[in-house]
């Protein structure tokens, strides 16, 4: 049934390539456990015991953290919902499967770091990827959107674009820095997969010496694993969007306007993007308590 499910997803124009790959990886993980257990799974096999073993397999054997596991189980549940919608009899134990999400540390760049990136002397290839990242910083969009900005989206002093992920419209002010970079490439970009783009951006940020060591905690059930990593390793395509939102907040841009520019529909989601300004925190707290 999973093969049929994946084939239908392939034929659906509404399913992105990245999402399709996630369904395939879940299927492969199930097949791997099936092989390890030397058994054959049927729809009725996916009971409480199976999910306990499957989650343990992903945590222990595949070293998948709880936050990633939660997303994977979400994709797996889509398969079972599809089964029910199509009249296939399946075990309903999946409905009670729940993985606790853990707070995740995300990076956004400071004003001076954005300026540092903009001023770096780089070779032609890295110069292009740096500029594309800065387009994300100046526009506040996801990589899937800021990498496809086009003149046809211009409406007066704004770029109006519908997000690929959510279908929501963003009204992006065509500020001088953004327009300068878009014009530099004649609004025409050669795209690479976001994972490869992240590697390029991390290389650039390493050159920029964003070397501050940060402790990252990952949870695997009740097990916590802490690891020290340089800050540049935590920077990726989505850091651009977080940076736009965080710097807009620090510049006192009203939240409602930031939401219109980014296509974000809820204040809760917006707050999740906004990173702590530790310098501002210290300044205000020292003023209050010293």
Which residue ranges define each predicted feature?
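Residue-level marker of regulatory loop/turn positions in helix-turn-helix DNA-binding domains and
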Residues: 43, 68, 106, 124-127, ...
